[in-house]
Amino acid sequence: MRTFKKTNLRAWQQSALDKFLATKPQDFMAVATPGAGKTTFALRIATELMEDRTVERVIVVVPTEHLKTQWSSAAARVGLALDPAFSNSSAVNPSMDGIVVTYAQVGMHPFKHRAVASARRTLVILDEIHHAGDAKSWGDGVKEAYDDVNHRLALTGTPFRSDDSPIPFVQYVDDGEGHKAVSYTHLRA
């Protein structure tokens, strides 16, 4: 059985990880301030799911090119090999655990990304998911590409958009009040 490097988690990360692992839902959103550890949290979920063979591939979707390398480097530190050089004209490197792509890449060729995601049991991490509505093609592409994946983990510090566009895979329920799932203070972040 393959094992990954486990780092100590902050209290909010451990609480959210426990909540995720209890049910392993198709959709899960982590909302946390910048610097709170969303990347670390997401990579822990990825390694847990890879380790227990719930998923066989990890795809990370980011808003900008420079974040592709950042995510790949962070993943390498926990033993997860994510290819930041994957392009819409290349094949998936079979020696890698997954890929890191931009929302723009997915928007340009959603059917290619759908094929990559559906070829194996997949976790898709949608970093800064609120950006998926920045260009209509980004949100539409993400929905087309990842509608049927096993697990989607959305990360954001901003769980809403100023233009009121819906964020893909976020369920909106107008109940007049919000409900927290996991909370933490700035000090605990």
Regions found by a protein language model. Give the residues of each.
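Conserved pre-motif I regulatory segment
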Residues: 1-29
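Walker A/P-loop
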Residues: 25-44
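Conserved helicase ATPase motor motifs in RecA-like P-loop NTPase domains
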Residues: 33-34, 148-165
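Conserved Walker A/P-loop ATP-binding site and its immediately adjacent core
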Residues: 56-74
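Conserved RecA-like helicase motor-core motifs
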Residues: 80-89
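Conserved helix/coil segment N-terminal to the catalytic DExD/H
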Residues: 90-97, 104-119
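SF2 helicase catalytic motif II
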Residues: 116-151
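Conserved small/polar residues in nucleotide/adenosyl-binding loops
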Residues: 185-189
